[in-house]
């Protein structure tokens, strides 16, 4: 009996770090308080004892003081230039989505053999380093949920169909044709950087008409043939809590994506719909506990490790004076 990708990830993968360059990567733009998210993510990865660094793909409009905060938190700053798609005449779900096309630059980071991309509004509550050992040649991500009003322009939403629970509403083949391909949320991706892929992404994006969900739609189209779904535990989209609670066990969740309106911890708004739920407030509280934990600040963490594990501390110290303080040249391909 063939084991599914999901079961293979959870059951059979072993971690081997020797001679392999791996890293987490996130994306940062603008001069607002989004740096707080990256700090929270960096501290979350430390809390779960991840063995790998956090690279921050940073646009030129990120202030120097914000960059220094991230360096002080052990992040590796990687400067990138924006990627602009063709003009969108229909509009995006959110106006700021247009800048997210710049995330395509992470495929250029070929100094890493495998990377895990995480949006800034994500927190890691369990170690997911084992995902680096997924088979090469594929893009791994979690299936999205179509039940929120942000999907109102899609045929899935209009007929009440969601790929998270396809048994609830059968796709009407007679009237709408074949079911749509499985569609992933691009807030969390496991991928292998590759220059050929990178250059092709930049070429294809310039001849592809932008759509409602911007780079997420584009990535779904581009990687359709090599996409492999992984369990929702690796990217819990908030809407799953009230749309598909039968699929969710919070004790098993590794990664939480604070993407629902009002749910972002640094500007939590209990007045927004669903934000008065106790499970939401608990997850927001957990984010703040990590963010405010000074023992997870990079310097304090290294000092603690030096007492517990001198070898680990030596490696971390070398990183501090070597990799972390080095901001690589910007990409402008």
UniProtKB/Swiss-Prot annotation:
Protein name: Galactinol synthase 5
Pfam family, one: Glyco_transf_8
Keyword Glycosyltransferase attached: yes
Enzyme Commission identifier(s): 2.4.1.123
Active-site residues per Swiss-Prot or TrEMBL entry: 103
Function field: Galactinol synthase involved in the biosynthesis of raffinose family oligosaccharides (RFOs) that function as osmoprotectants. May promote plant stress tolerance.
Gene Ontology process terms (BP): galactose metabolic process
One MF annotation (Gene Ontology) recorded for this entry: inositol 3-alpha-galactosyltransferase activity
Gene name of this polypeptide: GOLS5
InterPro entries in the record: Glyco_trans_8 (IPR002495), GNT1/Glycosyltrans_8 (IPR050587), Nucleotide-diphossugar_trans (IPR029044)
Positions annotated to bind Mn(2+): 119, 121, 257
Cofactor requirements of the protein: a divalent metal cation
Stated family: Belongs to the glycosyltransferase 8 family. Galactosyltransferase subfamily.
Entry's Gene Ontology cellular component terms: cytoplasm
Reaction(s) catalysed by this chain's protein: myo-inositol + UDP-alpha-D-galactose = alpha-D-galactosyl-(1->3)-1D-myo-inositol + UDP + H(+)
Entry-linked CDD domains: GT8_Glycogenin
Key word Transferase present: yes
Keywords linked to the UniProt accession: Carbohydrate metabolism, Cytoplasm, Galactose metabolism, Glycosyltransferase, Manganese, Metal-binding, Transferase
Localization per record: Cytoplasm
Biological source species: Arabidopsis thaliana (Mouse-ear cress)
Highest taxon listed in the record's lineage: Eukaryota
């Amino acid at each position: 009996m063939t084991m599914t990708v999901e079961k293979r990830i959870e059951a059979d993968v072993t971690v081997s770090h020797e001679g392999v360059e791996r890293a987490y990567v996130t994306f940062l733009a603008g001069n607002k308080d989004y740096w707080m998210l990256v700090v929270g993510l960096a501290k979350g990865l430390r809390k779960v004892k991840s063995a790998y660094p956090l690279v921050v793909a940073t646009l030129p409009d990120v202030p120097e003081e914000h960059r220094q905060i991230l360096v002080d938190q052990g992040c590796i700053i990687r400067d990138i230039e924006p990627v602009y798609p063709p003009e969108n005449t229909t509009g995006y779900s959110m106006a700021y989505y247009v800048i997210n096309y710049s995330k395509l630059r992470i495929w250029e980071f070929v100094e890493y053999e495998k990377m895990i991309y995480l949006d800034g509004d994500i927190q890691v509550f369990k170690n997911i380093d084992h995902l680096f050992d997924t088979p090469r040649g594929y893009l791994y991500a979690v299936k999205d949920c179509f039940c929120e009003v942000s999907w109102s322009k899609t045929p899935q939403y209009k007929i009440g169909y969601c790929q998270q629970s396809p048994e609830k509403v059968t796709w009407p083949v007679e009237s709408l044709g074949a079911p749509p391909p499985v569609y992933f949320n691009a807030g969390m991706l496991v991928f292998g950087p590759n220059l050929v892929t990178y250059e092709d992404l930049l070429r294809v994006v310039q001849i592809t008409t932008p759509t409602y969900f911007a780079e997420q739609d584009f990535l779904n189209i581009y990687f359709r043939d090599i996409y492999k779904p992984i369990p929702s535990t690796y990217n819990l989209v908030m809407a799953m809590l009230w749309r598909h609670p039968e699929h969710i066990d919070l004790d098993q969740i590794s990664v939480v994506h604070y993407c629902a309106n009002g749910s972002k911890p640094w500007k939590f708004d209990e007045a927004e719909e669903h934000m008065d739920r106790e499970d939401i407030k608990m997850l927001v509280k957990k984010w703040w506990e990590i963010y405010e934990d000074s023992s997870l600040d990079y310097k304090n963490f290294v000092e603690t490790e030096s007492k517990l594990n001198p070898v680990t501390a030596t490696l971390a110290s070398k990183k501090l004076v070597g990799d972390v303080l080095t901001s690589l040249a910007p990409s402008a391909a």
